[in-house]
């Protein structure tokens, strides 16, 4: 790795940079995109095409203090049932606007805690989805499972619904750290769940672990990673904890004095990364790892890796429909986002309309910049030939962008015969480099019009 001091001067430890799971990022969406435009974009999906679905369940039995996701606590099933009824109505709205023959290629249930849905609601939602968008034979159906909020009946219902992949949030197995973030989930409980899933024939197991949590040390992270690897997940994501109490007030419960500093965070990530690579996983992008033969590793090797709202993916569908409060949809034309408030979302759906609250219509420049950012984060390079073949950008203008970026990141970025490349030792700066192509982020010194 390039000298840490050099990377630090370029912003490694103090820059606040988007994850770029979309471009533009969601904070840059505007209110000018309406439910009518959302409906029109759905109607424009060609007959016989394929789409992906994301179903958002915002409810949790407990609110983990570290989490900044759009969630709300409930001890009753009543709001969950009302929400599920609205999801079925939203699916009916979708079905009414889809062209004949549109198929479901991929589906993900996230939250929140999707597994707090009772078995009957899991069955009902699966049937409503099947009625709205018939599945392909090879449809990949993934679900986020909380090991503390699952039982045999709900697992039965999910497998009967066609679940093929499970994502488990581990965070850290140290009891002290779990107590400090409001998420107690023992290794033994997680182990029993993974063994049950494998016994039932689960095709893919994903796991997330966090670094930068309070009280974390390199030896402690090593212990948690080794325990996680003993469960043989197919994919592992090593994600940085973002302490943003101004955005997520529940994080005020976490004592800031116990949170590792920037240099310590880098050491924690490198500790986890080294152990995972030693265990035979392949690194995919910045922070994902996959076993050889896993579709994600294959997509990475073939240059087909993409960014999505779940991170790195091999999903090639151009259209992603988000269902539920705050869910985001992606179309070739742009992005739409449902009302973040559950009550506002339910009110709109019950009145027979989508709850679209904001979004963004993509310009040609957005598409170009979005693709360059995606290439940097997926492949750590921008292919000159691919960009020129796909977009109407003058070669000399593209070279100007490359030179400006390379000058801003000396010793980290270089111009090659193939295009622009982030050197291996500079890859921790990939998101910061990508930000230099973001015309909506003033702190990233946006480039001029293309």
Swiss-Prot record:
Co-factor: note: Binds 1 [4Fe-4S] cluster. The cluster is coordinated with 3 cysteines and an exchangeable S-adenosyl-L-methionine.
Record: residues binding S-adenosyl-L-methionine 1: 54, 111, 144, 328
Domain of life of the organism encoding this protein: Bacteria
Positions contributing to [4Fe-4S] cluster binding: 60, 64, 67
EC identifiers of the protein: 1.3.98.3
Catalysed reaction, written as an equation: coproporphyrinogen III + 2 S-adenosyl-L-methionine = protoporphyrinogen IX + 2 5'-deoxyadenosine + 2 L-methionine + 2 CO2
Cofactor(s) of this protein: [4Fe-4S] cluster
Alphabetical list of InterPro entries matching this protein: Aldolase_TIM (IPR013785), Coprogen_oxidase_HemN (IPR004558), Coproporphyrinogen-III_oxidase (IPR034505), Elp3/MiaA/NifB-like_rSAM (IPR006638), rSAM (IPR007197)
This protein's record includes keyword Cell inner membrane: no
Transmembrane stretches, start-end: none
Swiss-Prot/TrEMBL GO biological process terms: bacteriochlorophyll biosynthetic process; porphyrin-containing compound biosynthetic process; protoporphyrinogen IX biosynthetic process
UniProt binding sites for S-adenosyl-L-methionine 2: 66, 112-113, 171, 183, 208, 242
Pathway stated in the Swiss-Prot or TrEMBL entry: Porphyrin-containing compound metabolism; protoporphyrin-IX biosynthesis; protoporphyrinogen-IX from coproporphyrinogen-III (AdoMet route): step 1/1
Disulfide cysteine pairs (residue numbers): none
Span of domain Radical SAM core: 45-282
Subunit structure, as described in the record: Monomer.
Annotated NCBIfam families: hemN
Function summary: Involved in the heme and chlorophyll biosynthesis. Catalyzes the anaerobic oxidative decarboxylation of propionate groups of rings A and B of coproporphyrinogen III to yield the vinyl groups in protoporphyrinogen IX.
Protein name, UniProt field: Oxygen-independent coproporphyrinogen III oxidase
Species assigned in the record: Cereibacter sphaeroides (strain ATCC 17023 / DSM 158 / JCM 6121 / CCUG 31486 / LMG 2827 / NBRC 12203 / NCIMB 8253 / ATH 2.4.1.) (Rhodobacter sphaeroides)
Record gene name: hemZ
